Design a protein with these regions (language model features):
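Class I SAM-dependent methyltransferase SAM/SAH-binding core
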Residues: 40-42, 47-91
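Conserved catalytic/acceptor-binding region of the Class I
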Residues: 112-113, 121-182, 198
Length: 241
């Protein structure tokens, strides 16, 4: 099998290929919280803005933050005029919903700061991968750890993260988020756009990482050439005291 030698534009690949894979998660969370007119929502790690766009379509007043400059630029292009998307979160609005659909342990200091300006009772949503045995993408992600020569890092403990930010638990859920791609090349580009393989690319080279991702994808390539990987994501809802 030969590597997929295609130009890579990570932010655009994220926006055009990968970001939509979590639409079921966004919808489930918004339904759970009743996001709509009157909701003031801040999206942390908002990427190129799809989750914000969906909340705005429900009538919510939204703002976003992401440290990836290229993704922020794309979010500003696609979101309605007047929506603020910055590289650092604004604390100007008294948010009543804060989402972190790609939660990591690194967001804890910023989360503590934001919750101080949030309304009492405001919902904070933290989300991440579900159980490894329920995620077909997990063996593919192990490629990144192996090529970067370190043990696979466990995902963040969402409940501990909420507790560390001084929040009180309010609920949780699991959502099926299958990753479906039109082709193997599309799957490689989408997965590379997540940033999960950046360290592996630095440790080896892009063509090697592409080749090994393709090999790991082989069990999930269907006869028509499409790629289908069932996954489950988990979210935790916590409240500002």
């Amino acid at each position: 099998m030969t590597p997929t030698l295609v130009p890579h534009h990570p932010a655009r690949d994220w926006a055009e290929i990968q970001e939509r894979m979590l639409v079921p998660l966004y919808e489930a969370v918004y339904d759970h919280l009743g996001v709509g007119a009157g909701t003031r929502l801040l999206g942390l790690g908002c990427g190129s803005g799809l989750a914000l766009l969906m909340a705005a379509a429900r009538g919510a007043r939204v703002a976003g933050a992401d440290r990836d400059h290229a993704r922020v630029a794309l979010a500003r292009e696609r979101l309605p005029e007047g929506v603020t998307v910055t590289e650092e979160p604004s604390e100007d609005l008294p948010y009543d919903v804060i989402t972190a659909f790609h939660a990591t342990d690194g967001i804890l200091p910023g989360l503590r700061s934001l919750t101080r300006s949030a309304q009492p009772g405001a919902a904070v949503v933290l989300a991440g991968w579900g159980p490894p045995e329920r995620c077909a993408t997990e063996p593919v992600l192990r490629v990144a750890a192996r090529l970067a020569d370190h043990a696979p890092a466990p995902g963040p403990d969402l409940d501990a993260l909420a507790a560390g930010a001084g929040l009180r638990p309010s609920g949780s859920g699991r959502v099926a988020c299958p990753f479906g791609y039109a082709s193997e090349a599309s799957a490689v580009r989408g997965l590379l756009s997540t940033g999960a393989f950046d360290e592996a690319v630095r440790a080896t080279d892009l063509s090697q990482v592409e080749k090994e991702i393709e090999e790991a994808l082989a069990p999930y390539v269907r006869p028509d050439g499409t790629v289908w990987m069932p996954n489950v994501f988990r979210y935790v809802v916590a409240r500002v005291p």
